[in-house]
Design a protein with these regions (language model features):
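Bacterial lipoprotein signal-peptidase II cleavage site
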Residues: 16-36
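Periplasmic-binding protein-like
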Residues: 147-156, 256-276
């Protein structure tokens, strides 16, 4: 059994082959291929693509499944593809991001329980300690609302900024910064672009998966690492709401929460750059 990886860049024209059958009945999702049911899952390449590949190569066949992975490097695409029926499920996002997508786009998408967490980190080519960030420094930050709030919370915990009283960190944006003692200048960019802009800024807050794809290790290379305890940003399997009770989808989610997957995550990312959430 082989996982098929279909890389899709943000600027590419999407020609997604839809193999998911929209419908709410049991076993309605996926494409039957002999004794196996093929599920097409959209995911970011690292670590979700790696985790799905492990499941496909080691666990899926015994559960009657064949997993085909469609890789995305643009966060705006997997939920649209799922909503449009081009894929059967996706695995790339956290709950605050899904909530913002549902509210903004009207998607009817349901999340399962978190599988893994990729801590955010602050990276710099020149600065070795967060305390050494100079006045008027330029710091790269996500431009999507849910991840921007996450980055601001991490910077607040490091006492680089202070958010206004009563602001929920999940919803925080740059205009919610009340105190900025070093007069840090924020440079907004798409999550996938932040690692590429490190030469142009003093430091940058980068998503764990994007950092790994760029050859950066959050736990080892970051000058500031997000706290993992009570973190609401775990990534999960998501499906169209009408398919949340589908038996094949539930089988896949069970595999993703299996002891084998937990051990795989702990062994492959023993440095803590990716953590199991179960």
């Amino acid at each position: 059994m082989k996982t098929k990886l279909i890389a899709i860049a943000a600027s590419a024209t999407l020609l997604l082959s839809g193999c998911g059958l929209v419908g709410g009945g049991t076993d309605s999702v996926g494409e039957k291929d002999g004794d196996l049911t093929k599920l097409t899952v959209g995911a970011t390449p690292v670590p979700q693509g790696d985790i799905l590949k492990f499941v496909d190569e080691n666990l899926a066949e015994d559960a009657g499944l064949d997993i085909e992975v469609t890789e995305y490097t643009d966060y705006t695409l997997p939920n649209k593809a799922l909503n449009d029926g081009d894929i059967d499920a996706n695995y790339f996002q956290h709950k605050p991001y899904l909530d913002s997508e549902v509210e903004g786009q009207g998607y009817e998408i349901t999340a399962f329980d978190p599988i893994n967490l990729e801590p955010f980190a602050l990276f710099s080519n020149d600065i070795k300690d967060v305390d050494d960030i100079p006045k008027n420094a330029k710091i790269g930050i996500n431009n999507d609302p849910s991840n921007q709030g996450r980055a601001l919370k991490m910077l607040e915990d490091a006492k680089l900024i202070t958010l206004k009283d009563g602001v929920d960190a999940v919803d925080a944006k740059l205009s919610d910064v009340e105190d900025n003692p070093k007069n840090v200048k924020f440079v907004e960019a798409d999550a996938a672009q932040l690692a590429r802009t490190l030469e142009d800024v003093d430091a940058s807050v980068i998503n764990g998966n994007n950092a790994l794809e760029a050859g950066l290790n959050p736990a080892e290379d970051g000058i500031l690492l997000e706290e993992a305890e009570d973190n609401p940003y775990g990534n999960f399997l998501a499906v169209r709401t009408e398919n949340k009770d589908d038996e094949n989808i539930k089988k896949l989610d069970e595999l993703l929460h299996s002891p084998e997957v937990k051990k795989f995550i702990e062994d492959k990312w023993a440095d803590g750059s990716v953590l199991p959430s179960f």
